[in-house]
């Protein structure tokens, strides 16, 4: 790989905040020129917020499945805009409400990510934060009035408070409060609230004098032992986050389930392949950070180990294909809307590979291609997909387990997982531990498997938690990450440029709705 002088990536990275913000404003302005009316989910969110702006607090669209957090923020934003002299209709217009998400993407989320990355990455936090805020599934919705931006922002703020040094009482309270607020945007955030609670426990555990522990079992048992101690710090943490869980349980009881509306189309399933799709998503979008030739060499070398020669073929040729075929779900929403990229991904890749069906179903070329050739293509797709899934799962697990330091920091002093030097209390880093990793795995599985619809937005938080805690390594050594952050930012912005171009400048029409422009999006 081409070696770039260290100063060049650092200078270029210094320009990424300005470039990211400028691009977001350009995208926002173009969206409101070319698509001034509500689009797809906005046809539910914007009218609902406008009902609140009119004071109709009892009005509710039964098709809406998430709580009213976005609409409350939109209402508050509109009230503030009226103080500047705007009329109520102008302050609560589509343009004004979309600005709520733009504000989050260019101000709120970067600031929150900086705080988080300062605790996890140290001095490289500002580079990491602005690289990460350009993540396509966040950045794309800067110009649309969707719930995902503020749902993500509130979970990140809860994490930022939980990572505070020594986890003081008021920071725990603020973190738990933000966990509760996050539930007003997406109900499954309760699972990530549990992850934040574990992070707060680990932060309190090791910053209050626990001896460093090596190994998974030692760390897990040490954390469990600390959790059951009757001491004020852990009692404060448990009560704070348990209150959020109790409140959410009450909501489930009153509501009769997790979906707020349209319950017939939002029934929980057993969608194990959703985890596989998420793994592919994380590995693909995160490749500038994890990719090195040494990392790939380690994967290839492991193929010749005992486990590699036994377990890997079992997964690739038997287990993964069987799970895909037995538990894949073709949701009606997936088939009904050709405005989403996943519609084409399912029809042209996933479905032929999973069910080993001939691709002429998509290509409509049965007469042009020999049936035996089609069978070969189908089988090849099947095992190529299975191999890609296995590598993605291995990659995510390996990058995270390699990011767990050899020793946990104690009272601000210990091994710096970046350069091996001692750490001062001022920059005490909150590293990944085995309890945190297992909590992340649990939250990912519990949030994805019940979801029958393939939806990339469900992968935002699994991706962000992986990216926040994943430490790039080369042959087991920590590396300077400036060049990787720069490559990551370029990769994200290339994806953003492509998706924005398709969204804004490549519209199409449905035959049954002539004259109405449809647009491609995530």
From Swiss-Prot:
Location in the cell reads: Endoplasmic reticulum membrane
The principal location of this protein is: endoplasmic reticulum
Q: Which residues cross the membrane?
A: 8-28, 96-116, 125-145, 152-172, 181-201, 234-254, 275-295, 300-320, 388-410, 434-454, 488-508
Cellular component, GO annotation: endoplasmic reticulum; endoplasmic reticulum membrane
User: Which GO BP terms, alphabetically?
Assistant: dolichol-linked oligosaccharide biosynthetic process; protein N-linked glycosylation
Q: In which pathway does it act?
A: Protein modification; protein glycosylation
Q: Which InterPro entries match?
A: Alg10
Record's bilayer topology term? Multi-pass membrane protein
A Pfam family recorded for this sequence: DIE2_ALG10
> Could you tell me what reaction this enzyme catalyses?
an alpha-D-Glc-(1->3)-alpha-D-Glc-(1->3)-alpha-D-Man-(1->2)-alpha-D-Man-(1->2)-alpha-D-Man-(1->3)-[alpha-D-Man-(1->2)-alpha-D-Man-(1->3)-[alpha-D-Man-(1->2)-alpha-D-Man-(1->6)]-alpha-D-Man-(1->6)]-beta-D-Man-(1->4)-beta-D-GlcNAc-(1->4)-alpha-D-GlcNAc-diphospho-di-trans,poly-cis-dolichol + a di-trans,poly-cis-dolichyl beta-D-glucosyl phosphate = a alpha-D-Glc-(1->2)-alpha-D-Glc-(1->3)-alpha-D-Glc-(1->3)-alpha-D-Man-(1->2)-alpha-D-Man-(1->2)-alpha-D-Man-(1->3)-[alpha-D-Man-(1->2)-alpha-D-Man-(1->3)-[alpha-D-Man-(1->2)-alpha-D-Man-(1->6)]-alpha-D-Man-(1->6)]-beta-D-Man-(1->4)-beta-D-GlcNAc-(1->4)-alpha-D-GlcNAc-diphospho-di-trans,poly-cis-dolichol + a di-trans,poly-cis-dolichyl phosphate + H(+)
**Keywords recorded for this protein, A-Z:** Endoplasmic reticulum, Glycosyltransferase, Membrane, Transferase, Transmembrane, Transmembrane helix
- Which E.C. number(s) belong to this protein? 2.4.1.256
Which Gene Ontology molecular function entries are recorded, alphabetically?
Answer: dolichyl pyrophosphate Glc2Man9GlcNAc2 alpha-1,2-glucosyltransferase activity
The UniProt similarity line reads: Belongs to the ALG10 glucosyltransferase family.
* Described purpose of this protein according to its UniProt entry: Dol-P-Glc:Glc(2)Man(9)GlcNAc(2)-PP-Dol alpha-1,2-glucosyltransferase that operates in the biosynthetic pathway of dolichol-linked oligosaccharides, the glycan precursors employed in protein asparagine (N)-glycosylation. The assembly of dolichol-linked oligosaccharides begins on the cytosolic side of the endoplasmic reticulum membrane and finishes in its lumen. The sequential addition of sugars to dolichol pyrophosphate produces dolichol-linked oligosaccharides containing fourteen sugars, including two GlcNAcs, nine mannoses and three glucoses.
Its protein name is: Dol-P-Glc:Glc(2)Man(9)GlcNAc(2)-PP-Dol alpha-1,2-glucosyltransferase
